[in-house]
A protein has these predicted regions:
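Bacterial N-terminal signal peptides that target proteins for export
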Residues: 2-14
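Bacterial N-terminal signal peptides
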Residues: 13-23
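N-terminal secretory/targeting leader peptides
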Residues: 29-120, 143-342
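Short, solvent-exposed loop/beta-turn-alpha elements that line the ligand-binding surface or hinge
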Residues: 120-144
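Lipolytic serine-hydrolase domain surface
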Residues: 343-414, 419-430, 449-465, 469-507, ...
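The conserved beta1-alpha1 loop
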Residues: 436-440, 541
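Short substrate-entry loop that stabilizes the transition state in hydrolases
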Residues: 443-448
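Gly/Ala-rich beta-loop-alpha elbow adjacent to hydrolase catalytic centers
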Residues: 512, 516, 520
Length: 659
């Protein structure tokens, strides 16, 4: 008891010093954000938050983090509920602390996959899964529960420590094993062991007294673990279970931050994740020596393929068809190793950079830096519009967004749709055309503008580009929020497109990406209501349910004089959309390729099938596809004139792009 109290006092002393150091270094008027962390993971939690605090972006944004360790008032089991209730703005959260997780909630099926024992071979495989489309699925599951998921948070995988020496997993049969979390129980039962649920502190005592034969335990980065000392002469079986962790925010608190603050936290979180992963790999690499130092034999579950097969089968029994779809997604991610990275071609140099404008219904925060000026709040305010001042990057890889500084030209932002349309149309008179770009889900204002600058140079367009920047939340967990923002944007899009149509330019082209295509089909409806056509509509990877897309084109498609759809069967983002919406989206190719009257469909599956990539932005970063998109935008060329191979299916002609 005295030892435990002494350790707690040491921990609190370290925490007090850390907080005091941050406060002393902080700037006057800094915003303090409380971060609730689980006491059982305090060491790794402190390291993660310390990494956030060191970030120059966080310091420049004037943010400070105050660590609050779970206790009797704020128990670890309630961290998820406390965040949802708004008691804290931020938390480090374990999957088991998400409300509903312990109740076999299939709305968290991908999350449970990443935390189930023996599904993923080791921590490196865990990181690959997190960075793949599967990680986006997990983020969206958290978003459906009301969390703003900002990053993953990794700690070393748990191990099984036994008091008697074991040589294979079969030797666990008949052993009584203490486990801290119920998700370990099923697979241990499959192995013939008897799991006993108890806290980590109780497990050490039970192992010492012989009340259990083994214990599931985690070794922190400092290498200290009382179970190892208690089990002298036994064995350490590593890589048993990776319990997934997250940095999450209360959604209202996240939306309420300034854009500069959100961007700083997101940037800092990327570095904190990198540091945490390095710590995990170092900790796990040290386990064989740690086992030897405690007179334990060492064995890793990574060598036991049979047990991994049993773990998958056990997990599938619990998750049913939903689990099968997610496991297939994992297998697709793991099927092949990523190819050696190839340097993309350089972007073409433009003698006369195209003019870029923006129109946004995002809240105007007034930041002097355009990158941080517009936020993500849905506030009933007039449309903001302006021209972007920029200098083209001296060197930029094809398909990448602009990297240089951006600003508001002449420091002038106009309000309302008609003045905006007038501003843009004046720039478009020379070529009698304008391109309206509607970005997709998980885009910040800054990224959408930078992508528009990049593709406008790559495509060689001469017409001005107007970025319609709707209030996407800008994080992977924001899918539901973003769908709400699409609906919120409807009246703004209506006023803007009608004002543009009234300017009587010769060609208005819509370029819509992903979820932005939902706004684009609204625009077609508004054009139909006004009785004025849109000359050119390009859908790149449209995330619109196929039935909705077909209905919209049947009702309003004749007001698109040329409509082109680019689809890809390897688009993992749209495969995820299919799972979430229980219907294939319009941009998914292959067996789900959408063919309908009034739309020229181009299947790009043969040229965009990169391993471990989402394959969702082919219209911008795959040269063969981008070249075709540029022809459509610059020349309004029909597919039959662009030298594309064609085929016929169910009476409809479609085209393909080949290597």
């Amino acid at each position: 008891m005295g030892t435990m109290l002494s350790k707690q006092l040491q921990v609190w002393g370290i925490l007090a010093f850390l907080v005091a150091t941050i406060l002393l270094a902080g700037s006057p008027g800094a915003r303090e954000l409380g971060v609730l962390v689980p006491a059982e993971d305090e060491v790794s939690a402190r390291q993660f938050i310390a990494s956030l605090s060191k970030s120059p972006q966080v310091q420049e944004a004037g943010l400070e983090f105050k660590i609050v360790v779970s206790n009797t008032e704020y128990p670890s089991s309630q961290i998820g509920s406390l965040i949802l209730a708004g008691k804290f703005p931020l938390a480090l959260l374990r999957s088991s602390q998400i409300p509903g997780y312990q109740a076999d909630d299939n709305s968290l099926v991908a999350t449970s996959l990443l935390s189930s024992p023996l599904i993923l071979a080791d921590s490196s495989a865990q990181f690959v899964a997190e960075d793949s489309i599967l990680g986006v699925v997990v983020e969206q599951e958290l978003g459906s529960k009301g969390f703003a998921a900002l990053s993953f948070w990794n700690t070393a995988a748990s191990s099984i420590v036994t008091k008697t020496s074991v040589n294979t997993a079969r030797d666990l049969m008949g052993l009584k094993i203490s486990v801290p979390k119920m998700q370990s129980q099923d697979i241990l039962l499959e192995m013939g062991a008897t799991p006993v649920s108890m806290s980590a502190d109780d497990a050490v005592l039970a192992l010492d007294k012989g009340l259990v034969d083994a214990s599931e335990t985690s070794v922190e980065s400092d290498g200290k673990n009382e179970s190892l000392q208690t089990a002298e002469g036994g064995s350490l079986l590593a890589q048993f279970r990776h319990e997934q962790g997250f940095l999450v925010a209360n959604e209202d608190a996240w939306v309420g931050l300034r854009q500069r603050e959100r961007a700083a936290i997101q940037e800092a979180a990327q570095e904190a994740v990198r540091q945490a992963r390095l710590t995990v790999l170092r900790t796990e690499a040290n386990l064989p020596m740690l086992a030897k130092a405690n007179s334990l034999s060492y064995l890793s579950f990574t060598t036991l393929d049979k047990e991994q097969t049993a773990a998958r089968a056990s997990w599938l029994r619990d998750t049913g068809n939903e689990g099968k779809a997610i496991l297939e997604l994992l297998d697709e991610v793991q099927r092949t190793q990523p190819p050696s990275p190839m340097a993309p071609p350089l972007a073409p140099h433009s003698e006369a950079p195209p003019r870029i404008f923006f129109a946004t219904n995002r809240n105007d925060e007034g930041d002097p830096d355009l990158s941080y000026r517009f936020g993500i709040q849905r506030i009933d305010s007039p449309l903001s519009c302006g021209e972007v001042a920029y200098t083209p990057d001296p060197v930029r890889a094809f398909g990448l967004p602009h990297e240089g500084e951006i600003a508001v030209a002449a420091s002038q932002v106009t309000k309302e749709a008609k003045p905006c349309a007038s501003l843009v149309s004046q720039a478009g008179r020379k070529n009698d055309a304008v391109i309206v770009f509607i970005h997709g889900y998980n885009n910040s204002f800054d990224f959408a503008v930078r992508r528009a600058i990049g593709f406008s140079q790559d495509f060689g367009v001469k017409a001005p580009v107007l970025v319609l920047a709707w209030p996407s939340q800008g994080i992977g967990s924001g899918y539901v929020y973003d769908m709400g923002s699409v609906d919120y944007t409807r009246p703004y899009a209506k006023d803007l497109i009608r004002a543009l149509l009234d300017e009587k330019l010769g060609t208005i082209s819509l370029l819509a990406h992903s979820m932005g295509s939902r706004v684009a089909v609204q625009v077609l409806e508004f054009a139909a209501d006004a009785g004025k056509p849109i000359q050119n509509v390009v859908f790149v990877a449209p995330d619109v349910p196929s039935s909705n897309f077909i209905q919209s084109m049947r009702l309003h498609g004749h007001y698109a004089q040329l409509a082109t759809l680019y689809a890809n069967e390897h688009d993992l983002a749209l495969k995820l959309s299919k799972i979430l919406n229980r219907q294939a989206p319009a941009g998914l190719g292959g067996a789900d390729l959408l063919l309908t009257k009034g739309v020229e469909t181009v299947d790009v599956s043969a040229v965009d099938r990169q391993t471990l990539q989402t394959n969702h932005s082919h219209g911008f970063d795959v040269p063969q596809v981008a070249s075709d998109v540029s022809l459509v935008l610059r020349q309004r060329s029909k597919a039959s004139t662009r030298n594309l191979p064609s085929a016929v299916h169910n009476g409809f002609t479609y085209w393909t792009i080949t290597p």
